[in-house]
Amino acid sequence: MRTTAGLLAVFVLTVAVPAMAQVAPTPAADQVALLASDNPRLARNKRHVFDFWRIVYEGGHVDQAAKYMAEGYVQHNPNLPSGRQTFVDFFRKQRPPKPVAERMKMPVITIVADGDYVSVFSARKVRDRANPSHVYYITWFDMFRIDAQGLIAEHWDPSEMWVDGKPPGAEFFAEWDK
């Protein structure tokens, strides 16, 4: 009887696991609508981060970094250096300038502002390195602190130290980052 119950439990769990498929995060239909706020300062901060991302980060127009970033910019991602000029030098090699899109290319879920902080939440599709056939979704965040001059002074994200130019454990699909 115990063997039958044990086999039944294994069968139920084996069948149930695929049925509990992850629901992918849903990107916002209208990114510009996410910039609205009753508080003008919060709306300005969200717009500043939105424009920085489109123009400098995705668009590769690092020549405009001073318009968006403080000189003493602090980077909390362990894979990138701090400092506006080191950011410019790094991304100048990575991203040639291209036309600026009207919206962020990454699939933005929401943009939230609180005081001097703006957080952008986005959907990312990743492949498990240990099981390459397993593709799943995560919700990523990028958080920025805006200083008294209205410039991006700090950036945080959940990135871990990359190995051989790749994130540990998973591979991001960066269709939007081209």
Protein language model features and the residues they cover:
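Bacterial N-terminal signal peptides that target proteins for export
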Residues: 1-7
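N-terminal signal peptide c-region/cleavage motif recognized by signal peptidases
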Residues: 16-18
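Short, low-complexity N-terminal intrinsically disordered segments enriched in polar/charged residues
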Residues: 21-63, 67, 71, 173-178
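A solvent-exposed, acidic/Ser-Thr-rich amphipathic alpha-helical stretch
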Residues: 62-118, 133
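Short beta-strand segments that buttress and anchor functional surface loops
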Residues: 121-130
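Short beta-strand edge/turn micro-motifs at domain boundaries
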Residues: 139-171
